[in-house]
Amino acid sequence: MYPGMLSEKRTNALPRGEIARGKSAVSRLFSQGGRLKGGFLLLIYSASRPVEQAPRIPVRVLFTVGKKLVPRAVDRNRIKRLMREAYRLEKNILTRALAFDAGKGDHQVMLAFLYRARADAIPSLERFRAEIRHMLKNLLSNRLPQTREGDRIE
């Protein structure tokens, strides 16, 4: 196989199951979720009972870029790729802190990263990583709801 071929197994990719899907779940996240503002990203988050399709996935994530802010599809796709890669590299902050065990985990965290800046200068991967790292640490420090036992989901 040649490097980069589609049939090659991608071990470092963000798993499909971690991508938030479903109109009802996404609309519930946008209507009821908490918000964290960053420099050029907005994070919408909520912790809830796991959905039936993915009960063992502790975190589901969504990436979006508005067409009004970034009119060219090429730029929107590049920004989403950068956000996905930055999240993939920084998600261990969240997954380690959640210490999710499939047998006892009773919450699922849903995240939506929204790009809020213009397409004039697309931030670098390092800037995306720094922004996402800061947002995830802020989310863990004081934003996630309490569990049934009264302990923070950490």
Curated annotation (Swiss-Prot):
PROSITE patterns to which the protein is assigned, alphabetical: RIBONUCLEASE_P
Keyword Nuclease tagged: yes
UniProt keyword list: Endonuclease, Hydrolase, Nuclease, RNA-binding, tRNA processing
Listed GO MF terms: ribonuclease P activity; tRNA binding
Entry keyword Transferase: no
Gene3D superfamilies referenced in this protein's UniProt entry, alphabetically: 3.30.230.10
UniProt-listed Enzyme Commission number(s): 3.1.26.5
Catalytic activity field: Endonucleolytic cleavage of RNA, removing 5'-extranucleotides from tRNA precursor
SUPFAM superfamilies: Ribosomal protein S5 domain 2-like
GO biological process: tRNA 5'-leader removal
InterPro entries: Ribosomal_Su5_D2-typ_SF (IPR020568), Ribsml_uS5_D2-typ_fold_subgr (IPR014721), RNase_P (IPR000100), RNase_P_CS (IPR020539)
UniProt xrefs under HAMAP family: RNase_P (MF_00227)
Function: RNaseP catalyzes the removal of the 5'-leader sequence from pre-tRNA to produce the mature 5'-terminus. It can also cleave other RNA substrates such as 4.5S RNA. The protein component plays an auxiliary but essential role in vivo by binding to the 5'-leader sequence and broadening the substrate specificity of the ribozyme.
Subunit details: Consists of a catalytic RNA component (M1 or rnpB) and a protein subunit.
Record family assignment: Belongs to the RnpA family.
Name of protein: Ribonuclease P protein component
Organism of derivation: Chlorobaculum tepidum (strain ATCC 49652 / DSM 12025 / NBRC 103806 / TLS)
